[in-house]
Regions:
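Short, solvent-exposed loop/turn and secondary-structure capping segments
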Residues: 49-51, 96-97, 192-195
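Short, flexible hinge/linker loops that cap or flank conserved catalytic cores
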Residues: 4-6, 174
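Short beta-strand to alpha-helix junction loop
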Residues: 103-123, 133
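N-terminal FAD cofactor-binding segment of flavoenzymes
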Residues: 42-90
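Conserved Rossmann-like nucleotide-cofactor binding loop
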Residues: 20, 45, 187
Length: 224
């Protein structure tokens, strides 16, 4: 039996509340305040699935939110000192930072928590009228009869490990939109489906990936 699903309609649905998805929603709202925009975030809260900290160059943020310094942003700690080292088996060798390409020099940048930046960007987006739904993972792409993307479906809830519906089962929603933006990150499963379905990687160099580790340090507040 086909599951009956509730549906919602938007001008734009964005999959993923990372920096790209949040910045997209803010720019769209700045350009056209009447747009009806929602963001789906699989994490329990915005920032929950952000991998790491960040040495942050503010140029893009300066363009997006020029007065970010006056809006209680979490961007506070400037880079005060940096070293570039070549590591050997027993020793390291320092290289003068002024000889490095400008893209590798961080003296004007900030050290931030990327998760905190995303949370702050989320408040800026919501202040503009963007709707953000944490805890809702987009699990399926919805196509029309002409193979055009017309939205996404969120995951069903209340399913046991064997795949059976529990008493608490709730079907996912169909989120329809005129434009669907996929900002899941480098290996999002919906993004991979789109790439495969429409041969977007044809003639392109294969993507390269690195392994990331997330380590959380708790530091007394008086030390930062």
């Amino acid at each position: 039996m086909e599951i009956q699903r509730e549906s919602m309609d938007y001008d734009v649905v964005i999959v993923g509340a990372g920096p790209a998805g949040l910045a997209t929603s803010i720019k769209l709202k700045q350009t056209n305040p009447d747009l009806n925009i929602c963001i789906l975030e699989k994490g329990s809260e915005v920032g929950a699935h952000i991998l790491s900290g960040n040495v942050f160059e503010t140029r893009a943020l300066d363009e997006l939110i020029p007065d970010w310094k006056e809006k209680n942003s979490p961007i506070k700690l400037k880079v005060k000192k940096e070293k570039f080292l070549f590591l050997g088996k027993e020793k390291s060798f320092s290289w003068p930072t002024w000889l490095l390409p400008s893209v590798q020099q961080n003296h004007k940048n900030y050290i931030i928590s990327l998760a905190n930046l995303c949370r702050w960007l989320a408040t800026q987006a919501e202040d503009l009228g963007v709707e953000i739904f944490p805890g809702f993972a987009a699990t399926k792409i919805i196509y029309d009869d002409e193979n055009k993307v017309i939205g996404v479906q969120t995951g069903d809830m209340g399913i046991d490990k064997a795949g059976n519906n529990k008493d608490s089962f709730e079907p996912g929603l169909n989120i329809f939109a005129k434009v669907t933006v996929f900002s899941e990150g480098c290996r999002g499963h919906l993004g991979k489906e789109i790439i495969s379905k429409f041969n977007l990687d044809s003639g392109k160099s294969p993507q390269q990936y690195g392994i990331g580790f997330k380590e959380i340090w708790e530091i007394p507040e008086e030390q930062h």
